[in-house]
């Protein structure tokens, strides 16, 4: 799975969960500042991402996610 495929899947999940248009979500979009996600939104997104990619996201790693790109890079590292 390459970065574009991961980004596309992540963007789709974010779009649905946060009720945003996919074209509003970029690799550099910040969850809180740009996408207006609150802590509950982020928690739910993490759950959906874990389900979608069949992987556990450790809390210490998740706390470092500021942008969509951070999530994409994390998943890319884990999926090799």
UniProtKB/Swiss-Prot annotation:
GO biological-process terms attached to the record: lipid A biosynthetic process
Pathway participation: Lipid metabolism; fatty acid biosynthesis
GO-annotated cellular components: cytosol; membrane
Keyword Cytoplasm recorded: yes
Domain Carrier positions: 4-79
O-(pantetheine 4'-phosphoryl)serine modified-residue sites: 39
Keywords, ordered alphabetically: Cytoplasm, Fatty acid biosynthesis, Fatty acid metabolism, Lipid biosynthesis, Lipid metabolism, Phosphopantetheine, Phosphoprotein
PTM notes: 4'-phosphopantetheine is transferred from CoA to a specific serine of apo-ACP by AcpS. This modification is essential for activity because fatty acids are bound in thioester linkage to the sulfhydryl of the prosthetic group.
Entry similarity comment: Belongs to the acyl carrier protein (ACP) family.
Functional summary from the UniProt entry: Carrier of the growing fatty acid chain in fatty acid biosynthesis.
Protein name: Acyl carrier protein
Source organism of the structure: Borreliella afzelii (strain PKo) (Borrelia afzelii)
